[in-house]
């Protein structure tokens, strides 16, 4: 069974939680969380003839170095990947300060490119990474037939159940907004006498 997030169909894995991160009120990436580790997923349009992963690896290495981190290429279960140590944009609860390990995975498909980022203990320990690697291997990218410029992110959409849950949550927040007060009902009055 897979959860359909538009272009990404993400498998349901035991012990994993699936989260969708938003940017500018739009779904930006899907993260599969297992324990203290995570796998961030994004799919991009790619040219018909060439893949993107070789170029993207070089760009990742340059960005990591520019941010004061370290990176190196290594062979992994999906081919060449980038092992990096980066400073998180903000402190991570329960993690020591300094550079944190991450693994960048990439797969070129027909007119699409799938990028995965493994973080947390799974970035260093293969036995912890194995379930997340299996999720990455089982992701289905639905490119669609419409034209999308190379390197543009393919559209991630929330499943209908998630949209309904968000609508229900927004409605509950609106109902609780006044904390039990009726905004159009007269409240306590104070009279000043001089």
Model-derived regions: residue spans:
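Short C-terminal domain-edge/linker segments immediately following a structured domain
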Residues: 49, 71-76, 117-121, 145-151, ...
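Short, intrinsically disordered/low-complexity patches at protein termini
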Residues: 64-66, 137-139, 150, 172-173
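Short acidic, glycine/tyrosine-flanked loop/strand segments centered on an H-E-D-like triad
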Residues: 107-120
